[in-house]
UniProtKB/Swiss-Prot annotation:
One of its GO terms (cellular component) is cytosol. This is Orotidine 5'-phosphate decarboxylase. The active site is at 62 (proton donor). Keywords: Decarboxylase, Lyase, Pyrimidine biosynthesis. The keyword Lyase applies. One of its GO terms (molecular function) is orotidine-5'-phosphate decarboxylase activity. The lineage of its organism: Bacteria, Pseudomonadati, Pseudomonadota, Gammaproteobacteria, Vibrionales. It comes from the Bacteria. Its EC number is 4.1.1.23.
């Protein structure tokens, strides 16, 4: 099977609406991301419903806690059968290492474990507000390096950082990029954005795209257009 590059970010407060959307798209064309709001509203059974429909799921809960608690949450995600799960890299090396080690018994069936560096909504002024007097890019590199040194599979990062991180951390280290908007789309609340083709060419491995697909009149056609544009490069 072709490794789908597109991860569709589901953003619904009604489960029936979410499943109605999901039933309009093909699991061969994308993966799905379930975040904090939907998981809190609908729980693990919603993820199981997506699995029944053939979709791989990125469980985007950004765990950040003491090592024991965080690693057990990661293990629970593995038990649920998700394809990818993430933790905040700012939780530190011990937390990330514990989370990686708890997945080792799952072997090839374990989910990808990804670190979150700097949220794409954050600018330098936001970092300064929490006591970090650094450029976002500098903090991203610092946390991404810590993530790799902790043995994780990759990081979430903006497309602007992808090229630098690929060069710094190697081709095998996966880069998952939100803030992706197909040409002509509304910027939304993401500050650091890029088109799908630009992001892949910059070094991103997977692209998180939400409203341009979920709010489209024909989401399957939008997905096909994005995938075709990526296949032609």
């Amino acid at each position: 099977m072709i490794d789908q590059k597109v991860i569709v970010a589901l953003d619904y407060d009604n489960q029936a609406d979410a499943l109605a959307f999901v039933d309009r798209i093909d699991p061969a064309s994308c993966r799905l991301k379930v975040g904090k709001e939907m998981f809190t509203l609908f729980g693990p059974d919603f993820v199981r419903e997506l699995h029944k429909r053939g979709f791989s799921v990125f469980l985007d809960l950004k765990f950040h806690d003491i090592p024991n608690t965080c690693s057990k949450a990661v293990r629970a995600a593995a038990e649920l059968g998700v394809w990818m799960v993430n933790v905040h890299a700012s939780g530190g090396e011990r937390m990330m290492t514990a989370s990686r080690e708890i997945l080792e018994p799952y072997g090839k069936d374990r989910p990808l474990l990804i670190g979150v560096t700097v949220l794409t909504s954050m600018e330098q002024s936001d970092l300064a507000g929490i006591g970090l007097n650094v450029e976002p890019q500098e903090q991203v590199i610092r946390l991404a390096t810590l993530t790799k040194n902790s043995g994780l599979d990759g990081v979430v990062c903006s497309a602007q950082e992808s090229s630098l991180l690929k060069n710094e951390l190697g081709k095998e280290f996966k880069l998952i990029t939100p803030g992706i908007r197909p040409a002509g789309s509304d910027q939304g609340d993401q500050r650091r954005i890029m088109t799908p083709v630009d992001a892949i060419q910059a070094g991103s491995d997977y692209l998180v795209i939400g409203r341009p697909i979920t709010q489209a009149t024909d989401p399957a056609a939008v997905l096909k257009s994005i995938n075709d544009s990526l296949a032609s490069k």
